[in-house]
Amino acid sequence: MKRFVLPGVAASVVVAVSLGTAGSASAQSAFQCEPGETYIMNVMVSGHPYWVPVYQGFKQAAEAMGCETVFSGTPDYDITKQIASFEQDLVKAPAGILLHPMQSDPFIEPINRAIENGVEIVTFAADSPKSNRTAYITSDNVAEATFAAEEIVAQVGESGQYAVLENPGQSNHDLRVTALIDYMEANYPDMELVGRQATNQDSNAAYRATASILQANPELDALWIPEAGSAEGAVAAVLEADADVLIMHADVTPTTLEHIKAGNIHMALNPNQGMQGFMGFMTAFLAAHPDMIDPFNDYQISGYNPMQIPFIDNGFAVITQENADAFDLNAYMEGRDPS
């Protein structure tokens, strides 16, 4: 399996882990939770399979340190309902929350208020960069888009037509789309963007949008989708039209995995979900225990949390027919606690 991660970030993580190991004999107790110390993972569309490996990684780190965890959020794709679930989490007074904000700006005030009241917030997979969140864990969305653009050109040539589906308002999805378009314009000007429609992770909307794009552009060569829900509908439309369109998307679901195995989807770029959850917990724990570090900066004067980590790249995997079996969620969950 191919993995992609920023060298600088990878090195810093390795150094951090090495230092933690070296000092474990003398400071082991510092990496343990107090009885009842709880961390929450909050998401939208809580039934989506993407969260399963993330929460497993979150729990693995927590269990190693004697901490308690809760999986929370809303089953709906609704920013108001997610914020309401976040507010309910705050009432429980957890030590920290690993948050996937559906939209960036609506979460600024709730995040800042949570931190002011002593609950540390780390974001993952999507961000609220204007908030005071302590850390952000994600795959490099620009690297994903660049990889996708180069793969599309490698398969269809430097001259052709492509389209994108999108999910406006979610930071990681926005970046996956805009970065690919910008890269194509800068490096492959003969690749023409002929369709761009918002489908908002809705497979039915994606089916209709893709059918419309195909009808208007029968010579379409490739389709890039920033998430897996829309890919489910898009591939159905392409198959129904019997069109020869190369499909690439980010993330993966059991449905799109089967289409990859069947050759209907060329490949998927999937964030390293387990590492996302594991590092998400670690950064939330460290944010809640800032006394564990005395860095060489002005944190004592400025008053900010010294555990600030603006960005950690958890890397991404390329899923193809050859390695698709390794991403079978049912196989992964065998023997694991799903709660």
Predicted regions and their residues:
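Beta-alpha junction/loop-to-helix N-cap segments that form part of ligand/metal-binding clefts
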Residues: D76-P129, A135-D140, A228-V235
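Hinge/cleft segment of the Venus flytrap/periplasmic-binding protein
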Residues: Q28-E37, N172, M184-N187, T283-S339
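Hydrophobic alpha-helical segments within soluble ligand-binding/sensing domains
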Residues: C33, Q82, I137-Y162, L175, ...
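Short beta-strand elements in bilobed, periplasmic/extracellular small-molecule ligand-binding domains
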Residues: E63-P75, Q161-E166, M184-S203
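Hydrophobic alpha-helical
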Residues: G96-E116, L180, T199-H259
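Extracytoplasmic "Venus flytrap"
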Residues: F31-M65, V70-F86, H100-S104, L165-L175, ...
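Flexible loop/hinge segments that line or gate small-molecule binding clefts
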Residues: E68, D105-A143, E151-A154, Q161, ...
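Short, solvent-exposed amphipathic alpha-helices that sit
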Residues: Y50-M65, E144-A148, N172-M191, A205, ...
